[in-house]
Regions:
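Extracellular/luminal segments of secreted precursors and ectodomains of membrane proteins
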Residues: 1-205
Length: 205
């Protein structure tokens, strides 16, 4: 299943994935907007960006592709992606933990799901530990994590493009830090995290 490899996971893992999707909307939204803001900043250095008539379309293209991998155009033409699901490359450095009440991070992530970034060291060993903590084999964990970021990103960004102009928000704040865009765009996604509302703008991502 090249477009949705998570459908091949064991049924129990698929059920947990469905639960996790609701639990990490805020975290994925913030990460996606931060990545889009950074990529738009890189694009602003291109000669074509000096043309004010092209800026909008350049940033719109960045936003359209932020939840997808390098095969975005190829997939849209009907071809299979090189990597199953064509997940965004920035998601490769993200892991997921399932928390329990009493865990140190639970108060900040009352949904029971926490995303984190791998920081240096042996990333593969870190993934194996995270997989073991969730009771998954490493292959299933990798599919689970990739699918989680991919599906949620496309929900909070792609499905909102008709109603919320993220590209315009980013274009208006290119010379600023992304925090204001994140607050403005992700407020609805983060509001449901009621227990963590006072601190939900700070996390490891």
């Amino acid at each position: 299943e090249m477009h949705n490899p998570d459908r091949l996971m064991p049924e129990e893992a698929q059920k947990r994935l469905s639960e996790a999707k609701e639990g990490v909307r805020c975290q994925v939204c913030k990460s996606a907007v931060r990545e889009a803001h950074a990529k738009a900043g890189e694009a602003s250095k291109l000669p074509s960006f000096k043309d004010k008539w092209q800026r909008g379309s350049i940033v719109t293209d960045v936003v359209a592709k932020i939840c997808h991998g390098p095969d975005y155009d190829k997939v849209n033409m009907g071809f299979f992606p090189t990597v199953a699901g064509n997940p965004p490359q920035w998601g490769e450095g993200i892991g997921v933990k399932q928390l329990k009440e009493g865990d140190k991070a639970y108060d900040k992530h009352p949904s029971g799901w926490k995303l984190f970034r791998y920081k240096g060291g042996d990333i593969e060993a870190a993934k194996e530990r995270a997989a073991a903590d969730m009771g998954l084999d490493i292959a299933t964990y990798n599919v689970f994590t990739s699918a989680l970021v991919r599906h949620v990103c496309r929900t909070v960004v792609d499905e909102r493009q008709a109603d919320d102009d993220l590209a315009e928000l980013i274009l208006d704040s290119l010379n600023e830090k992304p925090s204001k865009v994140i607050r403005d765009y992700c407020s609805n996604e983060c509001a449901s995290d009621t227990k963590a509302r006072k601190s939900h703008w700070h996390d490891e991502l």
